[in-house]
Amino acid sequence: MVVLGSTGSIGKNALKIAKKFKVGIEALSCGKNIALINEQIKVFKPKKVAILDSNDLNGLEPLGAKVFVGLEGIDAMIEECVSNLVINAIVGVAGLRASFKSLQTNKKLALANKESLVSAGHLLDISQITPIDSEHFGLWALLQNKALKPKSLIISASGGAFRDTPLELIPIQNAQNALKHPNWSMGSKITIDSASMVNKLFEILETYWLFGASLKIDALIERSSIVHALVEFEDNSIIAHLASADMQLPISYAINPKLASLSASIKPLDLYALSAIKFEPISMERYTLWRYKDLLLENPKLGVVLNASNEVAMEKFLNQEIAFGGLIKTISQALESYAKTPFKLSDLDEVLALDREVRERFGSVARV
């Protein structure tokens, strides 16, 4: 298989599962962590390797693997690969082209890159995509019982780093505090997206594209991250999916569902320790961006605006140019600005053009 973003949290776990399942690695790609990809090359001996920046070529030790550079290089590498499975764990809109290229070359796409569906779900062949996500894996598992007719899909949120922070202190928080996730060990972007609830807005849009626009879609807070998803059926019964907070479960099913179902990749749950499970509504006072959930479901192509504004604000937030309130304000202003715009977005070029436009318009934000 091919692992894009092999040095990140998902990529490292994917390689762990590949080793366990004895799946060969044809190609790897990374952003900046050349030291780690060099280690991965030694262990997995890929035939092809892609890195983002040509300045890193000197430090790369490909050990005979063919080397590709940049986003265009990743596209070319995917095209040359004979593997029928691509794991796309590239962070941000940078992973969008790789998703398109994987599907264009008739590969199955195991998708951890949320931005692909958020920005271009209407252009992707959903039948060839397996989401690498605990919530969507949970929904998929719950929807296997075809005898029951689903009415609404509910995903859970942990509440992120600021779930107990006094409301008046949230706007002045910095990136260091936002990165203290209570339950998961993840990359910096998704951890901050959890604090802002942008991650859950992304997942709501992913649910829309993956499982059908006709169903009611919502989210709630479940602090322990044990309940990942719930489905309410037409008979008013509800079934929940419970599992340890470990991404190896959805990754293993994305790589090989048969082997994943026969051997455990996560710790068993201690049912007697589950007395603390409690569901809470997502407070719009605490998570002000949550008020855009219905707008995004009514006009899901606004996902391009949500993602682009979030990425430019995130960069400034991580660079300590703005506080958390500035990040929220940037995204709010962008969504308000485009709320009534009818989008066509009939191909990838139009999606990327809107993405660039939003970045240019909202790239300079006020310090808050």
From Swiss-Prot:
Keywords on record: Isoprene biosynthesis, Manganese, Metal-binding, NADP, Oxidoreductase
Pathway the protein contributes to: Isoprenoid biosynthesis; isopentenyl diphosphate biosynthesis via DXP pathway; isopentenyl diphosphate from 1-deoxy-D-xylulose 5-phosphate: step 1/6
Residues binding 1-deoxy-D-xylulose 5-phosphate: 114, 134-135, 158, 181, 194, 199-200, 203
EC number: 1.1.1.267
GO molecular function, one term: manganese ion binding
The keyword DNA damage is annotated on this UniProt entry: no
One GO term (biological process): isopentenyl diphosphate biosynthetic process, methylerythritol 4-phosphate pathway involved in terpenoid biosynthetic process
Uppermost EC category: oxidoreductase
Residues binding Mn(2+): 133, 135, 203
Binding site for NADPH: 7-10, 31-33, 113, 115, 187
Catalytic activity: 2-C-methyl-D-erythritol 4-phosphate + NADP(+) = 1-deoxy-D-xylulose 5-phosphate + NADPH + H(+)
Cofactors required: Mg(2+); Mn(2+)
InterPro entries: DXP_reductoisomerase, DXP_reductoisomerase_C, DXP_reductoisomerase_N, DXPR_C, DXPR_C_sf, NAD(P)-bd_dom_sf
Family to which this protein belongs: Belongs to the DXR family.
HAMAP family given in the database record: DXP_reductoisom (MF_00183)
Job description of the protein: Catalyzes the NADPH-dependent rearrangement and reduction of 1-deoxy-D-xylulose-5-phosphate (DXP) to 2-C-methyl-D-erythritol 4-phosphate (MEP).
Protein name (record): 1-deoxy-D-xylulose 5-phosphate reductoisomerase
Origin species: Helicobacter pylori (strain Shi470)
